[in-house]
């Protein structure tokens, strides 16, 4: 069946909810869609829709990243609901990497919690430039001073991770109260109910404080592959977010990473189940590839303009090692340590071959909380380049975050 064509009328922004488990991220996502649907700018998604598959809901926590779309007066938004549970930081990294800005949800009744800090740190490491803070569950707080105290704590936390005070903005409210108000009166409008108005006010803040990112459309095309599937009779589709550049149907691209670099032609592009003639930096798309089998390609590889990126195994990087309080290791590690390097959309094992201090001296041991220059060698080549961010992981948890400073080989 022919798909509806995607119309580009407003600037496109990738956004998401971050914050501690049970502070109301998914409920807020539902409240935003319900509120914007009043103006015809969204399809209503209720909590179960966003929370995903049954086995994820059974534990009452969000495991995957759910994507919803909506519009405001000024922008078209693709919204990811990032998982909040510490076990699923890996998904948080894949989700947060897709954000031009974030809504940090903090329960006004509880204040900042360990995952609040962890998500702020991760947002910094994956390069989320702007944060709007939603102080949720305001209906559970009787004391205005308490609300101010929570705001102050969050402000200090954001400043500690170098988020400029200008780049975040606070909006109080209650996602649940807004949803209940809309459920009891679907004809409600802006100005009719204070809780619904607070969601509108939050989205006004998002429009104002999360600027339309300057897209890297002038640069060469690159997309990290998040998932791959086959469509019978049509071929293989690679999905992901276009990191930079523009890609058109008919373009020749390279598949880079793991094995030998392959060349293929793009036969189709889709976004939100609508067909596109071309995809731009920032778009979450599915790309149909000619003559590529499901076995030729896997998550973690990249699609790129031919000759623009090559796979490497050895690099130098600037790394921050998480403290115990941030969910990192309790003990030091040494040269020769072999953790996982989480690069764009995949885990690769690598050995740490050298630590170097700021003064150039060689260090044998690194403690939680240290910032260090680190040289690493991956077990197989992946597409990496200078300035690229990555996470260091061990046994399912993030223990460090880094940025590639120099490619060796």
Swiss-Prot record:
Residues 19-26 are annotated as: G1. Mg(2+) binds at residue 26. Residues 60-64 are annotated as: G2. Residues 10-214 form the tr-type G domain. GTP binds at residues 19-26, 81-85, 136-139. GTP hydrolase that promotes the GTP-dependent binding of aminoacyl-tRNA to the A-site of ribosomes during protein biosynthesis. This is Elongation factor Tu, chloroplastic. It comes from Trieres chinensis (Marine centric diatom). The gene is tufA.
